[in-house]
């Protein structure tokens, strides 16, 4: 699993925190950030440079003939797919944690409100005697 990342020298893909991708001239620059260890100020990162693939395609207009386009490198596409799997898995875990915490806060509010309601009813009963 994660063979493309391992081929880049990333032997522990589970340590990947996030990544960024930008284009510079005819290259795509991939920067992969790893989780910070305790006491570190900055996350470790590695940078990879992929040349964009040049393709000649038929132009839309019949009179223009052909035009050259630049596309993302196929190898980079596979690496990004693996990075997305890793990063989205982390996002799902964070979303689940947030949902559980939100549910707990809601439950806490409901229980507090119900306790106040019961105490109010008890107060009414004791005042009546």
Swiss-Prot record:
Signal peptide: none annotated. InterPro entries: UPF0325. It comes from the Bacteria. Coiled coil: none annotated. NCBIfam families: PRK13677.1. Belongs to the UPF0325 family. This is UPF0325 protein Spro_3794. It comes from Serratia proteamaculans (strain 568).
């Amino acid at each position: 699993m994660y063979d493309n990342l391992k081929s880049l020298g990333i032997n522990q893909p589970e340590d990947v925190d996030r990544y960024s991708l930008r284009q510079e001239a005819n290259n795509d620059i991939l920067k992969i950030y790893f989780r910070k260890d305790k006491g570190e100020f900055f996350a470790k990162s590695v940078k990879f440079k992929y040349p964009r693939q040049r393709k000649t395609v038929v132009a839309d207009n019949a009179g223009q003939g052909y035009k050259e386009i630049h596309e993302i490198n196929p190898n980079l596409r596979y690496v990004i797919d693996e990075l997305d799997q890793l990063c989205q898995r982390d996002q799902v875990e964070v979303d689940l944690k947030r949902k559980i915490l939100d549910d707990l806060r809601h439950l806490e509010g409901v229980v507090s409100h119900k306790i106040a309601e019961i105490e109010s009813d008890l107060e009414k009963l004791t005042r009546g005697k």
